[in-house]
Structure formats: C-alpha cells, structure tokens
C-alpha cells in the first residue's frame, strides 16, 4: 500500500501482527508474529516455569529465508521505496480516475495507497450490480492478462495492486491496458 504495514493507514497499533509474504520479497517461505512487549513478557520464561508458548513450523528458522528477510528489511531502510510509493499513489489514482471515472459501467473508484479498486456496475446512478453469473470482473481479468497486466477480480470489483517500485511510465501503460480491457469486455455486452 505504500506503508510498512496496512494498519499504519488507520493509525492503529495492534497488539499482535502476523507477517509473511513481503518479508522475503515473496521468494521464500517465512513468516513471523510480532507482539507488544507486554504480550512477549507474558510468555517469556524459563521452560521450567511452564508459561512459555511453545510452537514451531517446518519452515521456521530456515537460514536462507531469514537471510532474504533481513536483506529485504535492509533494502526498505536504505532505499526510498515506500516514500516513492506514497508519492506515486495519488498519481496512479488520478490516472485511473481520468481514464475511467466517467465510464458508464464504473460505479466507484477507491484507493488506499497504491491499491485501487474499480467497481463495475450495471447502472452508474443507482449503483445496481450485475448478475454475478456474468463474471465480468473475471472476463476483464483474463483480457488484461493476455495484454500483460495482472488484475485481481473479486466479483465485479477489479483490484489494481501494483508493485511498490512501479514507475510512472509503467503506471500509464498499466492503466491503459486496464481501461482498454474494461471497455473491450463491457462494450460487448
């Protein structure tokens, strides 16, 4: 989204967070659970005290995955990836709005950080949904994929979730493919 954690958008601090995919850039399986100091202290003790929370998984402590995770965190500290993503997020949303906001089958465009959602509707004024059996979101997903763009269809809402390092030129190209794919499918109904 352009923030280190999605909860940062809501200005909340959870007591427990589970992290995985982004830790290794998605290349190796690893995950971790992060807690407040108070929760950590409640379970930290010598084994004999019987209050330790003992758990593990087959992929825990893999040296290669841990090394990759540390390097990803170093890169996020050293390079302005999140700052650039935050700077580019409004630009991307504006591109999508300019291209699709007035299109008669787009009922809403919403965003948080770099993630944008494009809602397809049968009637723009009433926001009437399409019958789910048509699967227009999925049809648009397949059309865009053939053109080199990966969208995420959840029903008739298309999620545009680009990489944090996407350039503005790549954004322009991706938004054009997205808009062309939407029009190609929807103009044929």
What are these regions (language model features)?
Residues 1-189:
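Conserved N-terminal phosphate-binding loop of PLP-dependent enzymes in the Aspartate aminotransferase
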């Amino acid at each position: 989204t352009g923030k280190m954690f999605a909860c940062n958008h809501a200005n909340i601090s959870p007591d427990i967070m589970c992290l995985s995919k982004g830790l290794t850039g998605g290349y190796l399986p690893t995950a971790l659970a992060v807690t407040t100091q108070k929760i950590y202290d409640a379970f930290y003790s010598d084994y004999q005290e019987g209050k330790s929370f003992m758990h593990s998984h087959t992929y825990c402590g893999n040296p290669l995955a841990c090394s990759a995770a540390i390097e990803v965190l170093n890169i996020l500290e050293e390079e302005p990836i999140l700052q650039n993503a935050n700077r580019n997020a409004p630009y991307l949303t504006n591109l999508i709005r300019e291209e699709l906001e007035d299109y008669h089958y787009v009922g809403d465009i919403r965003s948080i950080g770099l993630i944008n959602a494009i809602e397809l509707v049968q009637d723009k004024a009433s926001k009437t949904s399409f019958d789910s059996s048509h699967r227009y979101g999925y049809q648009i997903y397949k059309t865009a994929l053939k053109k080199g763009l990966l969208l995420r269809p959840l029903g008739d809402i298309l999620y545009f979730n680009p990489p944090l390092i996407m350039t503005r030129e790549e954004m322009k190209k991706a938004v054009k493919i997205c808009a062309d794919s939407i029009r190609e499918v929807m103009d044929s109904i």
